[in-house]
């Protein structure tokens, strides 16, 4: 009789241990999922910020080059016009 109670108690303890382990595993899975999700968001934000800065830098370079080319062409045309004006005098 006592052997049967011991076996029953051991089975009950094993069942509770299994349930507790399942609960702990589930909790860890949730935490890992949340951490991975957060890391993904942070990574995406960092990539987007880097791309935005690169785009802004590229836009600035294009603007500077365009201004320089425009200025150089304007100077060349002005110089040519002045030269033609002197020839016409």
From Swiss-Prot:
Highest taxon above the source species: Eukaryota
InterPro entries assigned to the protein according to its UniProt record, in alphabetical order: FAM25 (IPR023243)
Transmembrane segments: none
PANTHER family found in the cross-reference section: PROTEIN FAM25A-RELATED
Family: Belongs to the FAM25 family.
Protein name: Protein FAM25A
Organism: Mus musculus
Record lineage: Eukaryota, Metazoa, Chordata, Craniata, Vertebrata
């Amino acid at each position: 009789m006592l052997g049967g109670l011991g076996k029953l108690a051991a089975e009950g303890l094993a069942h509770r241990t299994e349930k507790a382990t399942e609960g702990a595993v589930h909790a860890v899975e949730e935490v890992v999922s949340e951490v991975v999700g957060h890391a993904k968001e942070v990574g995406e934000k960092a990539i987007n910020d880097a791309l935005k800065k690169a785009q802004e830098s590229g836009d600035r370079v294009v603007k500077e080059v365009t201004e320089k080319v425009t200025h150089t062409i304007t100077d060349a045309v002005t110089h040519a016009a002045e030269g033609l004006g002197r020839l016409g005098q």
